[in-house]
Amino acid sequence: MGVDITILVGTMTGTAEMVAQEVLQALETAGHQGTIQVMDNLDAGVFQPGGNFLICTSTYGNGDVPDNAQALFNSLETGRPNLSNVIYGLIALGDTTYKDTFCQGGIRFDKMLAELGAKRAGEMLRHDASSGTLPEELAAQWVVPWVEQHLAPLQQAQDKLTSEMA
């Protein structure tokens, strides 16, 4: 049985959403399920009651999360919900031309989610817009191995723990 993942998209220009669409297609081809939610008007409630999440976000300005992700980020920051039932991964988009803020949108989400008890599966995928590679192609190649090597084992361990506590 495949893994079910919610892909949350923070974007300014639509690139992260395009990446998410390619990622979802790769997941579905490999027998997994997923949904895409653009972060517009989302709050921390999106993470309840838990589950598997993939944050796909660009970086904007001086290392900020995109405008459409601000409400969600602020909700996490002020509400401080317990996210111990959340397993997540990250696709961070940036440009090394801005080396001091490269992929900071993703890094900020990573730090916040970890502070709130969420468990990150594997390492963050960082795409450099100056690299000459297309972010959607890189992410589509990355996501299925990420699920199978990192996310699925964490989900199985969490499911076992939950059933033992029931």
Map each language-model feature to its residues.
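A short, well-structured beta->alpha microelement
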Residues: E28-V46
